[in-house]
A protein has these predicted regions:
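Exposed beta-sheet edge/beta-hairpin loop segments within beta-rich domains
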Residues: 16, 114-118, 126-130
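Amphipathic, well-ordered alpha-helical segments in soluble domains
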Residues: 23-29, 103-105, 134
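Central antiparallel beta-sheet cores of small beta-barrel/beta-sandwich binding domains
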Residues: 30-115
Length: 144
C-alpha cells in the first residue's frame, strides 16, 4: 500500500468496507509503533467489541502494550452519507471524518496519545483495507 492509501494496482479487491458492519462484534489486532527511522518503539495487542446502536456503532477498545501499559478507549462511529463516517472519542483534538472507497476506509484526525507517561498531541492518518470479510490491514501514520 502506498503512503496515500492507494493499493498499487490491487483494484481486484472487491470487499466493500462498511465500518458499521465490520466493527460489529469481537475484534483482535496486533501492531507496533515504528519511528521515522524504522525502529520499533512499542508493540501492542488490541481487543475490541463493537456494539451496534441506532446512531451507528460503539467500539470498545483495550490496548495492551509490551511495556505493561493498558489503555481503554470507546469510539462512536456514525454514518454521515453513503461513503462518509464520523468518529468520536474522548481523546480527539479535532474532527474525525472518514471516507470509504470500495475496500478502503481512511480518516485523519488530531489525537491526544499517551506516550511515555504523558499525553502528546499527534496527527493520525489512518488507512484500512478490507481484504476478506473478516480481515483488514490497517496502516496508521502518526506524526507530531
Amino acid at each position: 500500500m502506498a503512503p496515500d492509501g492507494i493499493l498499487n494496482g490491487q483494484s481486484h479487491i472487491s470487499n466493500e468496507f462498511d465500518p458499521s458492519v465490520f466493527f460489529a462484534g469481537n475484534l483482535r489486532a496486533t501492531g507496533m509503533f515504528i519511528d521515522r527511522f524504522g525502529v520499533v518503539k512499542r508493540r501492542f495487542t488490541m481487543s475490541a467489541t463493537g456494539i451496534t446502536e441506532a446512531s451507528g456503532i460503539s467500539l470498545h477498545e483495550t490496548f495492551n502494550y509490551d511495556d505493561g501499559d493498558v489503555e481503554d478507549r470507546i469510539w462512536h462511529i456514525s454514518r454521515r452519507s453513503d461513503n462518509r463516517f464520523e468518529g468520536r472519542t474522548d481523546d480527539l483534538a479535532s474532527d474525525c471524518i472518514g471516507t470509504v472507497r470500495g475496500p478502503l476506509f481512511s480518516w485523519s484526525y488530531h489525537f491526544y496519545l499517551k506516550m511515555f507517561g504523558r499525553r502528546v498531541k499527534v496527527h493520525f492518518d489512518d488507512v484500512m483495507v478490507r481484504l476478506t470479510p473478516d480481515t483488514v490491514i490497517n496502516r496508521a501514520r502518526v506524526t507530531k
